[in-house]
Design a protein with these regions (language model features):
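Positively charged, small/polar-rich N-terminal and surface patches that mediate targeting and assembly
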Residues: 1-108
Length: 108
C-alpha cells in the first residue's frame, strides 16, 4: 500500500512558488498545492530573522518526495529551505484514491 504525505516548503518569492507549482503539477508529482502567505521568524547564523514568506503545501505519495525535493531545488532561491514531510495518517479513502489517481511522477 502506498504511503501518502503532505510536504511543507517555505519560499520568499511568490513567482518562485508559482513556477514550482506549475512544474510539480506538470510532472504529476503532486495532486494539489496550497499557498499561504505568512510572517516567519527564525534563527540564521545565530541572528533572529523575520520576513514575509509563502508556505507551499503539496499532497503526494511519500515515495516521490526525493523527486519533489530535486525539482524544488531547481526553482528555490534559499540556500537552506524548509522541506518538511508530514505523513497523512487519517483521511477518507476517497481522498487517498484521488491522490493515487492523479499522482504518477514522470521519470526524469
Amino acid at each position: 500500500m502506498d504511503e501518502y504525505c503532505m510536504i511543507e516548503i517555505a519560499f520568499d518569492d511568490l513567482e518562485e512558488v508559482k513556477r514550482t507549482i506549475n512544474a510539480l503539477l506538470e510532472e504529476k508529482l503532486v495532486s494539489s498545492c496550497q499557498v499561504i502567505e505568512s510572517e516567519s521568524t527564525w534563527l540564521w547564523h545565530q541572528e533572529v530573522e523575520t520576513a514575509q514568506e509563502y508556505l507551499l503545501f503539496v499532497k503526494t505519495k511519500k515515495n516521490l518526495s526525493t523527486k519533489i525535493y530535486n525539482l524544488v531545488r531547481k526553482y528555490h532561491s534559499y540556500e537552506t529551505f524548509e522541506f518538511a514531510i508530514i505523513p497523512i495518517t487519517s483521511t477518507s479513502k476517497n481522498y487517498l484514491s484521488w491522490i493515487n489517481n492523479e499522482v504518477r511522477g514522470k521519470e526524469y
